[in-house]
Amino acid sequence: MHDVDSSERLSRRRYWINRITETVVGIGGGAVIAAITLIFAYLLWVVAPIFKSADIERSNQLRAAERPTALVDISENGEVVSRFSNDGIVEFYNQASGRALAGFDLGLQVRSIERVYPLVDLYALIDEERLLHFVRSQHIVNFENDQRRLASSADFPLGSDGIAIGEITAIDTHLFDSELLIVTANERELALRKYQDVEMGFGLGAAQQVTFKAGFSISNIYIGPRNQWVYAVGETGEIEIFGIGSLQRPTRMYRGTLVEPGQTLTAMTPLLGRYSLVVGTSDGAVTQYGIYTDAAGTRLDAIRQFALPSPAQRFVTEPRRKGFMALDQDGDVHLM
């Protein structure tokens, strides 16, 4: 009788141990499944927008004074809109509210202005006397009495003395580390100026200079990655790539064309760290070409192609990213 009671107690003990074990294992397994489900749900929430089509929304209109505009730009975080006028006035506006933040007079007439690659706050400005200046825009955030305040300013960080560049048909500028390279073209002739040990807040020193010629009249010119190449492009789509690793001995690496028979070049821009070129042609095609160098030499290969309803007139690239925007002749905008 004693043995029977002991066996019954042991059986009940095992029964409860088994039930508790099953419950704990079930809860643990359910928690693991729930955790995996949450992880996949989070990944889906993060990744899904990548596959969603982009859209464009109209923002606030800015109430600005009527002046001939040389350039409209926006800060990297999209908070401040800058307008550079041909009369040398720089205006900054809050993008969200359209409110004017600041205005400055550069004291010169602007012939043309564009960004210095790859920066988003330094501009190469050519005045009416064909002097090249470098203008910087700054947007500094301060907190006063727990209130966020944005202060915008414009200055000449490399000195106010301009660089005489003469009559030109194209220009590009590239600041790589502390090395500033300026390339200008006048018809077939290219002129390179290289400044070493460039530091903001100090004037430019003496430049190394070299000139050489392309095989055609140049309409567009771009400096390649790390100041190693120069792309020279003609109005009809001819292209030559020069190696400028040794500034005193530029070498022609490639010569060819960016258009097919029957096409004309309507727009182009460098992309992907300037290892590729995006080209728009008169039939509405937009082609991205990659530049490759190997033992066989240098070549251009088509990477991808898009078709627009009308020819592209201008491309706008996204800084440090692969995307770009195309504006066609009908005034429509396409994100790619």
Where are these regions (language model features)?
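Transmembrane alpha-helical segments of polytopic membrane transport and secretion proteins
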Residues: 1-27, 53-75, 151-154, 158-160, ...
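Beta-strand-rich domains and repeat architectures in extracellular enzymes and scaffolds
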Residues: 24-32, 38, 45, 60-88, ...
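Conserved beta-strand element within WD40/beta-propeller blades
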Residues: 33, 81-85, 123-126, 181-185, ...
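Short loop/turn segments immediately following beta-strands, especially the blade-tip
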Residues: 49, 135-148, 194-202, 243-250, ...
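A short beta-strand motif characteristic of beta-propeller blades
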Residues: 58-64, 99-105, 154-163, 205-213, ...
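Repeated scaffold domains used in trafficking and secretory/extracellular systems
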Residues: 66-74, 108-120, 157-174, 213-226, ...
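Short coil/turn segments that connect the beta-strands within blades of beta-propeller domains
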Residues: 77-79, 119-121, 178-180, 226-228, ...
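Structural motif
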Residues: 87-92, 129-136, 187-196, 236-243, ...
